[in-house]
Every structure is written in structure tokens, then in C-alpha cells.
């Protein structure tokens, strides 16, 4: 929606990676569309992608040689020749789509709010992902390595003492993987997202200049 596309009404299956999941397409290129930002292209996502959670295991069951976790990686092969950076945004769940995204990625950036439940969920996620991928790769003699796995603290409220304690837990658990940059919790970001935008889409006159500058920085 931040790119001006409404997922529920304006996104067709052909504009997503669903064709890769069904086997009707072998490249992501036909799904790529331009945006109003020069140099930034988009492959849309929509609720229709939940069909992949049934399509991929069904294809795996019918074809033992099929590797469901390599669908997106293979589909991106051609696109890698045309883009300097490809960003894949996934839901915070260990779904078939998320597994595909993590296998296709060269690096991982996890936004993590300093919240007890989010911190616990992140630890459980990595434990589950490691277990799943180990079993998948060991069976086929494959390996997976990342150039980086970084944690980005988001929605940080430095006035919240409990959040500061949990932030220290996160730093203790993930060590140098926690980036020195933090995204502050601010009402400006909430106001911008309510208008289907970001803090960079707001003008200074629409909010307190000091608060907006802090969000920009």
C-alpha cells in the first residue's frame, strides 16, 4: 500500500510470485512493475499468496525431486542481472513463502521491537528455521550461508524503562548482530502510515518540525 497499490482490490495473481508457486512461471520477471519512484520496481503481494501454503506442499508430495524451498531462489535468477539490490519483505511467520525468501536471500535484516513477546518470538523463529533448514539441506547435501544477519531495533521508546531492559537482553543475546542504528517510536510514523505513507512523505508543516526531524534522522 505504501507504493500506491491496494492489495485486496488492485493485485492480480499475475502480479505476484504465485505463478512460481503453481509452476506456471519459472521467472519473476513478468510480475515486476514500475513504481512512481525512479529506479524502484515492485512485485506485489496480496492475500492470494496464502494459496502457496497449499500449492507448494502439494507439489512436493507429488514430486519427490521438487524442492519447494528453492522456488523463489530460482525465480529470481534472471532478475538478479538487472538490479543492484533486491529486498524481500515477509510476514513474521515461518511459512512456505518465508522459507523461500530466506533461502533466496544473501543477507537477513530482522526488525525487532524491544518487547518481551517480540524478543521471545524472534528466538523461537530462529530455532525453528534452523531446525527446518537443517533437515532440508542435510537430506540433499546442501548448505546455506548468509553474508550478514543483522537485528534492527524498531519502535524504540527510550523513556520506557522496561523497553530499555529488554533492549539490553536483545544486545546480550544477539551481540554484534544488533545494529547501532535504531528506529524510534513516534506518533509521526503512526500518522504517516494511517495515510498510506511514510515519514518521508510528510511535510514539515503537517507536524512539529522537531518530532519530524527526529523521525527522519
Question: Which stretches of residues belong to each language-model region?
Answer:
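P-loop NTP-binding core
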Residues: 1-217
